[in-house]
């Protein structure tokens, strides 16, 4: 469950290390984002010579949350950290690699490129 002012790790090689959610997209009164949702983020920490720099405002897809997700079969999945992948306006990832596992729920939200780049899909 991601809301405004939430800090997230970046799970790709775009050059950003930490981002902060500044808006949850999808309706004027929407408060929380979950896995697969698009948010607007501000880059808080970045590596030198990366594709993005500190202070940039980008869109990102939430790929891991510490809040557990219920699946239709009754199982629950949760991660240790909140993480996101930076995307462009065409919903394509900015980085060329994804770090760490991503959940199957991204497939239902049509983020197939992120699933194909991920080393492990849970």
From Swiss-Prot:
Keyword Endoplasmic reticulum: no
InterPro entries according to UniProt: Ribosomal_uL14, Ribosomal_uL14_bac-type, Ribosomal_uL14_CS, Ribosomal_uL14_sf
GO cellular component: cytosolic large ribosomal subunit
Gene3D superfamilies linked: Ribosomal protein L14
Keyword Iron-sulfur: no
GO molecular function annotation: large ribosomal subunit rRNA binding; structural constituent of ribosome
Stored CDD domains: Ribosomal_uL14
Domain of life: Bacteria
A Pfam match: Ribosomal_L14
GO biological process, one term: translation
Coiled-coil ranges per UniProt: none
Keyword annotations of the record: Ribonucleoprotein, Ribosomal protein, RNA-binding, rRNA-binding
Family assignment from sequence similarity: Belongs to the universal ribosomal protein uL14 family.
Subunit structure: Part of the 50S ribosomal subunit. Forms a cluster with proteins L3 and L19. In the 70S ribosome, L14 and L19 interact and together make contacts with the 16S rRNA in bridges B5 and B8.
Role this protein plays: Binds to 23S rRNA. Forms part of two intersubunit bridges in the 70S ribosome.
Protein name stated in the entry: Large ribosomal subunit protein uL14
Naturally occurring in which organism (per UniProt): Rhizobium leguminosarum bv. trifolii (strain WSM2304)
Lineage, highest ranks first: Bacteria, Pseudomonadati, Pseudomonadota, Alphaproteobacteria, Hyphomicrobiales
Gene (UniProt): rplN
């Amino acid at each position: 469950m991601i809301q405004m002012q939430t800090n997230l790790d970046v799970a790709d090689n775009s050059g950003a290390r930490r981002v902060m959610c500044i808006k949850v997209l999808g309706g004027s009164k929407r408060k929380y984002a979950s896995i697969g949702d698009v948010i607007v983020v501000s880059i808080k920490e970045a590596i030198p010579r990366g594709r993005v720099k500190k202070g940039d405002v980008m869109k990102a897809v939430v790929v891991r949350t510490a809040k557990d997700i219920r699946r239709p079969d009754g199982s629950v999945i949760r991660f240790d950290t909140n993480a996101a992948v930076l995307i462009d306006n065409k919903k394509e990832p900015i980085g060329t690699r994804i770090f760490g596992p991503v959940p199957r729920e991204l497939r239902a939200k049509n983020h197939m490129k992120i699933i194909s780049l991920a080393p492990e899909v849970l």
